[in-house]
Amino acid sequence: MIYQIEKLIKEKLFDCKSCGQCVLSHTAMICPMNCPKGLRNGPCGGTLEGRCEVLPDRDCVWMQIDQKREIAPDTLHLAPKKELFNTASYVNLVKGSDRRTRLPQPVVDASHIAASSELARKMYDQEFVVTLEIPSPRTADGLKRVERIMRRVADKVDAVNTTTNAGGVPSLHSTETAKVVLAHGVEPVIQFCGRDHEEPELLEELEAAMEIGYRNFLLLTGDWLPDVDRGVDQQTWFPMDSLQMIHAVNGKLEDYRDRLGIVPFIGCASNPFSTPTTVSVQRLHNKRHAGARFSQTQAITNPAAFSDWYALLRKGREDEPKLAIPSIPLVGSQRAFEVLCRLPGVFVDASLHRVMEMEDFQRPSLEWAFKVAEDVMEHGAAGVHVMNFGMPAELIDEFLTEMRDRNVRARSRSEYSWT
């Protein structure tokens, strides 16, 4: 009876989704469970111009929340308990059964525990790094393609991201593709998505990955699955968001160090094109406090926007290591360009559209990418993350080969402090 009355009232007042562990008092009286992904700490990286990634005709719930209240960088909300869904939150409040998932929880400061990876060492030593993204194939046969790529690029990159179900399309897991990368003496960056994991499963799989030899991990909320109806439904809420994943792994660092002799290097995603920019920056600070040690951005197509975002990100932290790696798209086919334009959270600048309208666009597209890369280098980027969208192998290799020399030239022109 109490639940039915509460449901009736709160649905009318707050569009309540009956999670049973109400956080309205912490979210400016806006129900965060109206996020289709069910995020307790948002927004996700797919937000552009304040709109929802899943339902773009709607405003992003978390953008509304974060503009109405100050984000506490050193706390987070844990994933809600499923057993409390569709129960009376007032009863749960009195009983205390929702305490951990209702109240903001403090993050754990494990920043004194050094990560075990070579990528971490290079970044904290302020070496310029080049990382490359290789999508995991759908089947094991596709690993032959990964092998061919690694034979070409192994001596040109510091690490290789291997994806898991990129864009929500089923594929081999990142850890499987990464075995090919590791065999060539290159450190992989393993991806885990909150869309796919409850916390116990995440920690179990991450520990298994460390035992294989992996040290770098990118923890992402994840994209909406293409075959799932778009709407707000308890059944499609994601088990975890990226902040919760980072917090969970960060809380285990001391145990990993003492028991395994390994400390993972935790990374996250960021989006310089989410607006208002202050929310994007504050959320990245939140992830940093929770334990993220590095960040790879969404594809950068407008260096000026990146510069403004990065300056805001670095404000007051000028003496700290530079740990943000902007992603540079190499676009070599019209079909792949269309894919880029449809990716959640990716802003495609008019300058790239003009290049892709040319009859013979591959060389101009490569020169455009060189210009973007040099611009972000001049503004203090820790490195570049290369994403291929249909560019021929020889042009990818040219880009990777020239990155370090171009970085030296870009930094020599820069007014940015490198000390």
What are these regions (language model features)?
Residues 139-152, 174, 200-206, 276-286, ...:
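Short, acidic/polar
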Residues 110, 129-144, 188-200, 264-279, ...:
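Active-site mouth loops of central-metabolism enzymes
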Residues 117, 141-143, 168-180, 198-204, ...:
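Active-site-adjacent beta->alpha loops and helix N-cap segments on the catalytic face
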Residues 199-211, 278-288, 311, 334-339, ...:
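Catalytic cores of alpha/beta
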Residues 5, 86-132, 139, 254-260, ...:
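N-terminal amphipathic alpha-helix/helix-capping segment at the start of soluble metabolic enzymes
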Residues 1-30, 37-42, 46-112, 419:
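Iron-sulfur (Fe-S) cluster-binding modules
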Residues 130-136, 158-162, 188-192, 217-219, ...:
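Hydrophobic faces of well-ordered beta-strands that scaffold small-molecule active sites
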Residues 108-113, 222, 236-259, 269-274, ...:
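Active-site pocket-lining/capping segments in soluble small-molecule metabolic enzymes
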